[in-house]
Amino acid sequence: MSTVRKLNESALRGIYDAYMHEAFPPAELKPLAVMLRLMERGRYLCYGYYRNGRLAAYAFFYRHDSRVLLLDYFAVTPELRGRGVGSAFLAALDAVLGGVCILGEVEMPDSHDAGLNAMRLRRIAFYERAGFSLSLIHI
């Protein structure tokens, strides 16, 4: 049984401490205090994807307004990566969020490191398979 749950501050703290340092490079990880402040102000929405009562994946969004969310962090727990959990979670989130525009950002595959470029291309392909469209905006 799989469910999507909106997360509270306590759950955000737990995920941050248990999973996020492994899943994201230090330079990309916001301080927990910043996320909590945004959540208190209603500008940060956090969701967990649970399978059989255990966390399988999580997604954190910055809320621009009632119709637009920026996907800030998205990850599957290490033991479940590569098993379709991320795709299932995105589909379930789409149903829960009901027509909200979700924006995501990915790094372009323009590094001098071939391995890094391969990972970036896999990430882009994953989001495209999930229904995201690649824009021509480069920042």
Task: Please name every model-derived segment.
Residues 74-81, 108-109:
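A short, internal acetyl-CoA/4′-phosphopantetheine-binding micro-motif in the GNAT/acyltransferase core
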Residues 38-48:
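A short helix-loop-beta-strand connector motif used in the catalytic cores of GNAT acetyltransferases and
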Residues 1-34:
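Short amphipathic alpha-helix that is part of the acyltransferase structural core
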Residues 123, 128-134:
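Conserved acetyl-CoA-binding loop of GNAT-fold acetyltransferases
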Residues 48, 54-62, 68-75:
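Conserved beta-strand in the GNAT
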